[in-house]
Swiss-Prot record:
Residues 2-77 form the Carrier domain. The modification O-(pantetheine 4'-phosphoryl)serine is found at S37. GO terms for cellular component: cytosol; membrane. Belongs to the acyl carrier protein (ACP) family. Coiled coil: none annotated. This is Acyl carrier protein. The gene is acpP. It comes from the Bacteria. Carrier of the growing fatty acid chain in fatty acid biosynthesis. 4'-phosphopantetheine is transferred from CoA to a specific serine of apo-ACP by AcpS. This modification is essential for activity because fatty acids are bound in thioester linkage to the sulfhydryl of the prosthetic group. The keyword Cytoplasm applies. One of its GO terms (molecular function) is acyl binding. InterPro entries: ACP, ACP-like_sf, PP-bd_ACP, Ppantetheine_attach_site. The keyword Transcription does not apply.
Length: 78
């Protein structure tokens, strides 16, 4: 599970131009990491490609924090 968490943080860091170590599970995408709506769409596409999953529109609306991303991806991977 830590491997998945690390991959998620790496993708977020790459997409948003951040330092991976500054991203915590409690980090909020918009408020803390300054992601805009386009960033979130690009993150979803990157997660879908990396983990070979399809995130529904309803799930996408609930992606507000790093932990929420992990919870949704965990549902598909495990």
């Amino acid at each position: 599970m830590q491997n998945i968490e690390k991959k998620i943080k790496k993708i977020i860091a790459q997409q948003l131009g951040l330092i991976e170590q500054k991203i915590t599970n409690e980090s909020l995408l918009v408020e803390d990491l300054n992601a805009d709506s386009l960033d979130i769409v690009e993150l979803i596409m990157a997660f879908e490609e990396e983990f070979n999953i399809e995130i529904t529109d309803e799930e996408a609306e609930n992606l507000t924090s790093v932990q929420s991303i992990f919870d949704i991806i965990k549902k598909y991977v495990f």
